[in-house]
Regions:
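Conserved S-adenosyl-L-methionine
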Residues: 186-312, 335, 552-611, 618-621
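S-adenosyl-L-methionine
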Residues: 2, 8-38, 42-43, 47-67, ...
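Conserved AdoMet
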Residues: 44-107, 460
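Conserved helix-to-beta-strand junction in the class I
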Residues: 227, 295, 346-350, 664-671, ...
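C-terminal catalytic and target-recognition region of SAM-dependent MTase-like enzymes
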Residues: 307-402, 673-729
């Protein structure tokens, strides 16, 4: 008996696919293709091609975390001109791919092609498809470029054309969970790459924590949870391009979806690490919660409103992923660098030993970190070139700024009386400063006749302010005594000349033999109890941290907890920082000078505070109060002094303006609130009518610190409260 020989089935030739992706994600996509059964992958900029069966294409649509689109190539041909493009496209049997009642669109990319206009190339392909349908059935399919059912992709590379069906439809970064948007959101595909490259895998131990302290809309957290839970990114999508494709295999797709559902259910039954997110912006927190709920992960991810200043260690080990703000404008970047500085310090204090993934578009800012990055990846956030830095957070040891060591001055000789007084002041003040955690204070304030200058210590630096010679005095003799005093400073405190800055009271540069060139701007960071400030020791208008107001700032800190704080003519916001650090619920700082508010925001960031509840407003305080509808439990009014001049009516006019400002401020003070008035005018007294209408107290003597004891009070302070309401009847 002869057994018939059955002819061998011809193997179907493999299909050709291309997955497009953001720059820098190609190797991640290639790894996914291999995991989903693809073969012979080839990596190109922004795309990875491979061969495989239809299942590999479907799996990439369902499971790819990093790809943007999955294209199934139909054909390729030479197209030296648009007419050839039309003819070759007309040879394809479009009935195999597209139903006449399915809206479609053609999208094209062109690289070094003789057909240089991408939209014209797409139009010729569209015409070829529509003309073929019309010639066969008398009907033309509709074109919808905004929401097409089927997307046809044309890629022209030189004179070579490639046509493909877009199996993904909408870009794969659209997972389906984003319900609420925030400013500058990350694409989901990029967010997934950030957490994956930072070291997150399904095997992440459940006793650890994934933390994003600036979570925005929660995209990094959600993508992390989807990795941990073995969730297919495409499982929540409502539509794919292949659902409108005539060769779609419904049974295959259902099988893959059912498998993905089972895997996700199994993943959610496993022990999970805690996933935590914070943001200073309450609107961002609301958006994150909406997105997390839409992703079905509200039982896995916890988010809350919290300032970066409150960042603390939630577990012994964990992974921190963070995408700080970039600062598109130069002024914004200048402010945000201080947020980076705070983050660097806080991470070293709180999260030593944790892994970190730090995503930034500004290499200068990230380069200022004290961390040693173990890996760095070039990525793009849209058109913005970025880097993801990864590593392990090292513990940073912060040393409190020590006080200068005291040395014996030369005995006898010129300036001996000044040297003795300076040394006595230091011995009296240094123990007090250490006890009160104060590193910036006055060392000398015109204590002795003939030495009319002020010496202020700002941690490692000295600011020497010389006063003009008295009427009839010899300016050259005054300058000589100024230099004698500087010599004593160098001897007693061992301060090198480069750390001594000179200033002339009332503006202008003080001549002296010590100190750097005053034309160079020098910004330093200094501490004041638990606050950190920027000081400018080369600006004749002020340092940004007036030492005479220190006690007032500390009083504001003691009074701020649980209150809303308003700082009028708030300058560099130093009083606001004390309110923030000590628990103010919300703050508003008003000042007419943009430069002052720029420094105020920098000070906020330097202390880890930001968000819309801490506002800075550039406007005249009285004008702003006229339209204010908010109420504040604590208000500081910084009133300017009366300008020098021959106008005899100026003092009374200034007192009237102060009264108008105070009455307007009292209107926005809560019934139980406290208003503090500080005036840079030693002769100022409030109008009698204010004392009649409000409870008024002169608190100047209570706010005189040891370093200003015995000196004239040049900045009197007053406290105002509302009088109790009269009982009705």
């Amino acid at each position: 008996m002869i057994t018939p020989v059955r002819p061998k089935r011809k193997k179907k030739p493999p299909l050709s696919f291309v997955a497009t992706c953001g720059a820098g994600l190609e190797q991640l996509v290639a790894g996914e293709i291999e995991a989903q059964g693809g073969r012979n992958s080839a990596v190109n900029p922004g795309a990875v091609s491979w061969e495989g069966n239809l299942e590999s294409g479907y799996r990439m649509c369902l499971w790819s975390r990093f790809a943007s689109r999955v294209l199934l190539q139909i054909t390729g041909f030479d197209a030296p001109d648009a007419d050839t493009l039309y003819r070759q496209a007309g040879k394809i049997d479009w009935d195999e791919h597209l139903a006449c009642d399915t809206p479609f669109a053609v999208f094209s990319t062109v690289t070094d092609s003789p057909i240089s206009h991408s939209k014209y190339a797409a139009l010729r392909i569209k015409d070829a498809i529509a003309d073929q349908f019309r010639s066969r059935s008398g009907r033309r399919p509709s074109v919808d470029t905004s929401r097409p059912g089927m997307r046809i992709s044309l890629h022209l590379q030189g004179s070579r054309a490639t046509l493909a069906v877009d199996l993904s439809g909408d870009s794969l970064h659209r997972r389906g969970y984003r319900r609420a948007a925030v400013e500058a959101p990350l694409k989901e595909t990029l967010a997934a790459a950030i957490v994956y490259l930072s070291g997150l895998r399904r095997s992440f131990p459940p006793d650890r924590v994934v933390l994003d302290p600036m979570c925005g809309g929660g995209t990094l957290l959600i993508e992390a949870a989807m990795i941990l839970g073995d969730s297919a990114p495409g499982l929540q999508r409502k539509s794919f391009g292949f659902l409108f494709w005539n060769r779609h295999d419904e049974r295959l797709w259902e099988k893959l979806v059912n498998e993905a559902v089972r895997r996700e259910e199994d993943g959610h039954r496993q022990p999970w690490p805690r996933i935590i997110g914070y943001d200073a912006d309450p609107h961002a927190v609301t958006a994150a919660r909406e997105n997390i709920a839409a992703a079905g992960l509200d039982d896995k991810i916890t988010v809350g409103q919290r300032q970066l200043a409150a960042l603390e260690r939630p577990a012994d080990e964990g992974l921190l992923v963070v995408n700080p703000p970039y600062g598109e404008r130069l002024a914004d970047r200048e402010e945000i660098k201080y947020l980076y500085r705070f983050l660097d310090r806080q991470l070293g204090r709180e999260l030593a030993g944790w892994r970190i993934g730090f995503f930034s578009s500004n290499p200068d800012l990230a380069g200022g970190f004290s961390l040693n990055w173990s890996d760095s990846y070039k990525l793009f956030n849209g058109p913005i070139r970025c880097r993801l830095h990864c590593g392990t957070i090292a513990r940073t040891t912060e040393h409190a700024p020590g006080l200068p060591s005291l040395h014996e001055p030369e005995t006898g000789g010129e300036g001996a009386d000044f040297a003795a007084r300076l040394q006595a002041n230091c011995r009296r003040l240094f123990p007090w400063a250490e006890r009160e955690d104060i590193s910036c204070f006055r060392l000398y304030g015109s204590d002795l006749p003939g030495y009319d200058l002020a010496l202020d210590l700002y941690e490692r630096w000295i600011l020497a302010t010389g006063h003009a010679a008295a009427a009839g005095g010899d300016p050259r003799a005054a300058d000589h005594r100024f230099n004698v005093a500087l010599r004593a400073v160098r001897e007693i405190l061992a301060i090198p000349p480069g750390r001594i800055f000179l200033r002339k009271a009332g503006g202008g540069k003080k001549k002296g033999k010590a100190g750097p060139k005053p034309s160079r701007t020098k910004i330093f960071e200094v501490d004041e109890q638990r606050c950190r400030f920027l000081v400018n020791l080369t600006d004749d208008r002020g340092t940004g941290l007036p030492l005479a107001r220190r006690s007032l700032r500390l009083l504001i800190g003691r009074s701020a907890e649980g209150r809303t704080f308003l700082n009028l003519n708030g300058g560099t916001g130093t009083a606001t920082v004390h309110a923030l650090v000590n628990g103010a619920l919300a703050t508003t700082t008003v000042d007419p000078a943009a430069g002052q508010l720029h420094l105020a925001r920098s000070n906020f960031f330097l202390n880890g505070f930001g968000g819309p509840q801490h506002r800075t407003i550039q406007e005249d305080s009285l004008k702003w109060l006229a339209g204010c509808r908010s109420r504040f439990g604590l208000i500081l009014v910084n009133a300017p002094c009366c300008p020098d001049g021959r106008d005899s009516a100026a003092p009374s006019r200034f007192r009237l303006e102060h009264e108008q400002l105070l009455r307007a401020a009292m209107k926005v003070l809560t019934r139980e609130g406290l208003l503090l008035l500080a005036v840079d005018d030693p002769c100022f007294t409030p109008a009698p009518s204010l004392a009649a209408d409000f409870i008024l107290e002169d608190i100047s003597s209570r706010l005189t610190a040891p370093d200003f004891a015995g000196q004239p009070n040049r900045s009197p302070c007053f406290a105002f409260r509302h009088r109790p309401l009269e009982p009705e009847g």
